[in-house]
């Protein structure tokens, strides 16, 4: 499979991630423009700028069987996986052409959380070694080691860990391979590291200087509005999240 085919598959597979809500939504009527096209999304940098990002998965191969996910191991979809240098090269090419100002990188979980996280970190490492100074948002993989979370945080501008669903009961129902602790633990670790390095600039020992965020799937389970709002407020208070 060539690089363009991988980009087509993995850009499309990433477009419904709510952390970049400018893509994945359809428009009706006769106006021009399309927000449903995969590949480019918009986010807010630490200094308040709105930046255009290449939004893509490292791979849509996944060992998990989450009922809400298009890339579930049970689903019959076209699969692809980048090599780290391929995705780094694409990002640099798009950046030099002024198509994007940064990268939003997520992934399915292939082989193990640590293996997947290592491959994603390698993409970031290549970019920074090639003096890429653009914005990077990386989705941390629940279950990955703290050592890998540390490596990612020193390379990225923002990190996020998806809380996925409002309760452990909901996780058991729709994402039985995941647990609340595997999600909350990395959130807490990232919060601690951000606090320890607060005020330092990226490249001078800063850790995820634009903070961390998360997302929750609403409406797929019987959790009440009160539960969801209480959870969101608790996440903001305990983990100093930039956005839920």
Predicted ranges, named:
Residues 56-85:
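Canonical Radical SAM [4Fe-4S] cluster-binding loop centered on the CxxxCxxC motif
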Residues 1-61:
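Flexible, acidic/Gly-rich N-terminal and inter-domain linker regions that tether
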Residues 88, 111-244:
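Conserved AdoMet/S-adenosylmethionine-binding subsite of the radical SAM
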Residues 55-56, 85-96, 199:
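Short, charged beta->alpha transition segments
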Residues 6, 65, 99-101, 132, ...:
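Short loop/turn motifs at secondary-structure junctions
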Residues 74, 108, 164:
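Flexible loop residues that form catalytic
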Residues 53, 66, 105, 161, ...:
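Conserved, mostly hydrophobic/aromatic
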Residues 90-108:
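Short Fe-S-cluster ligation motifs
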């Amino acid at each position: 499979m060539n690089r363009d085919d991988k980009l087509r598959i993995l850009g499309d597979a990433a477009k419904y991630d709510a952390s970049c809500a400018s893509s994945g939504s359809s428009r009706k009527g006769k106006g021009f423009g399309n927000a449903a096209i995969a590949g480019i999304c918009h986010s807010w940098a630490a200094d308040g700028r709105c930046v255009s990002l290449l939004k893509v998965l490292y791979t849509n191969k996944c060992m998990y069987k989450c009922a809400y996910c298009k890339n579930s191991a049970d689903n019959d979809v076209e699969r692809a996986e980048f090599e780290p240098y391929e995705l780094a090269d694409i990002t640099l090419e798009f950046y030099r052409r002024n198509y994007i100002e940064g990268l939003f990188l997520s992934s399915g979980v292939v082989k193990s959380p640590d293996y997947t996280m290592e491959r994603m970190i390698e993409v970031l490492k290549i970019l920074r070694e090639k003096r890429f100074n653009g914005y990077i948002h990386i989705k941390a993989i629940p279950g990955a080691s703290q050592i890998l979370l540390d490596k990612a945080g020193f390379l990225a501008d923002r990190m996020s860990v998806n809380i996925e669903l409002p309760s452990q009961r909901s996780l058991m129902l729709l994402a039985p391979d995941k647990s609340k602790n595997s999600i909350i633990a990395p959130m807490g670790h990232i919060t601690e590291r951000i606090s320890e390095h607060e005020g330092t600039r990226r490249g001078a020992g800063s850790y995820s200087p634009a903070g961390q965020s998360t997302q929750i799937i609403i409406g797929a389970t019987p959790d009440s509005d009160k539960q969801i709002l209480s959870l969101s407020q608790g996440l903001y208070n305990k983990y100093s999240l930039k956005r839920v």
